[in-house]
């Protein structure tokens, strides 16, 4: 009887080892499916796409905002958007310090003065990009969406997004100084471009490649996807299409 127990124990041990190997293999496979790299032809630019926290990356981080570069949390800027998170986390939630950083950088940019009951009154063109820093964190804030001055609701669409990306990449060429550019899944937030996550990603990839072929943006661009998009975006499919 003791021998039988011993054999059962050994058998369990072997199964456990095999299970561990399988688990590690699955984890390795998962890791591979969570990160891909695309080498842009005719350039030395590498585009990395992976899941992670956009705010933990080194280099410049692109954040979409509305055309007023609003700074008041709640309305018109939700603290749950990346725009709101920047104000809350890196400017202490203080509109004044955020406004000061933006206005200092955009002092030579043209704008339209608009009377609003709430929010900033300087309206900039879509694609206008402000380079701002908060301690060691560096941001490129670019105007992606229009704001209804009555409801304060932000909105965008496909053609507007393309114009906004062009403005972002133009400023990136001038400002990053060879440092990495980090880009989230632009257009997936409350601005509501109206495309599924995979199509948004494809559009951003295409825009980066097209702009890079015209003139290099920077050597390394990271497209950082939030983990909540894992079930929506199959990076293996993206890899087969672009790599």
Where does each model-flagged region fall?
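Macrodomain-like recognition of ADP-ribose-binding/processing modules
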Residues: 1-243
């Amino acid at each position: 009887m003791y021998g039988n127990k011993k054999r059962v124990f050994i058998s369990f041990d072997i199964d456990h080892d095999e299970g561990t190997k399988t688990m590690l293999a699955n984890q390795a496979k998962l890791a591979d499916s969570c990160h891909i790299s695309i080498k842009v032809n005719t350039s030395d630019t590498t585009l990395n796409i992976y899941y992670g926290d956009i705010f933990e990356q080194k280099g410049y981080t692109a954040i979409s905002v509305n055309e007023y570069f609003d700074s008041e949390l709640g309305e018109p800027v939700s603290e749950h958007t990346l725009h709101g998170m920047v104000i809350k986390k890196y400017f202490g939630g203080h509109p004044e310090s955020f406004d000061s950083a933006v206005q200092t950088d955009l002092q030579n940019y043209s704008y339209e003065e608009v009377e609003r009951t709430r929010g900033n009154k300087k309206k900039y063109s879509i694609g206008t990009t402000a380079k701002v820093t908060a301690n060691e964190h560096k941001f490129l804030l670019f105007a992606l969406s229009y704001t209804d001055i009555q409801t304060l609701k932000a909105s965008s669409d496909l053609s507007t997004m393309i114009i906004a990306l062009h403005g972002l990449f133009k400023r990136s060429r001038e400002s990053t100084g060879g440092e990495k550019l980090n880009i989230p899944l632009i257009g997936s937030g409350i601005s509501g471009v109206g495309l599924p996550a995979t199509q948004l990603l494809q559009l951003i990839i295409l825009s980066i490649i097209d702009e890079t072929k015209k003139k290099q943006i920077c050597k390394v661009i990271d497209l950082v996807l939030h983990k909540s998009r894992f079930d929506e975006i199959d990076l293996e499919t993206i890899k087969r299409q672009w790599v």
